[in-house]
A protein has these predicted regions:
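Amphipathic alpha-helical dimerization/coiled-coil segments
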Residues: 74-88
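Residues that mark the N-terminal boundary/hinge immediately upstream of a DNA-recognition element
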Residues: 22-23, 62
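Short amphipathic alpha-helical interaction segments
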Residues: 31-46
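Basic, amphipathic "hinge/linker" alpha-helix immediately C-terminal to the N-terminal HTH DNA-binding motif
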Residues: 57-72
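Short alpha-helical segments that sit at the start of domains
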Residues: 1-11
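Short capping segments at the starts of secondary-structure elements
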Residues: 16-22
Length: 88
């Protein structure tokens, strides 16, 4: 896997946390080091894209985070379609 953009990393984290999961699972699913993950988690929580649930000690993607994921996926599909159209 090559270098990923910050938006791709954010999307990986939000996708992994959709429905709620632990920090360790997010780290493995998003292919991030512990330090990288902590940096991103702070940013995502500050911006209300992710929430920490004390009772279960899990992270969960918020409604705002789900909207971000939806837009990111739509843009990705649009770019993929544009690339395919240009190659034909």
């Amino acid at each position: 896997m090559g270098n990923r953009s910050r938006t791709e990393i954010v999307s990986s984290i939000l996708d992994a946390a959709n429905g709620g999961t632990t920090k360790t699972k997010i780290m493995y699913i998003a292919f991030l080091s512990y330090n990288q993950l902590n940096e991103y988690l702070s940013i995502l929580i500050e911006n209300n894209l992710l929430e920490y649930l004390d009772g279960t000690k899990t992270f969960k993607t918020t409604e705002k985070g789900l909207n971000y994921l939806k837009m990111h996926n739509e843009i990705g599909e649009l770019l993929q379609q544009t690339t395919m159209d240009n190659n034909n």
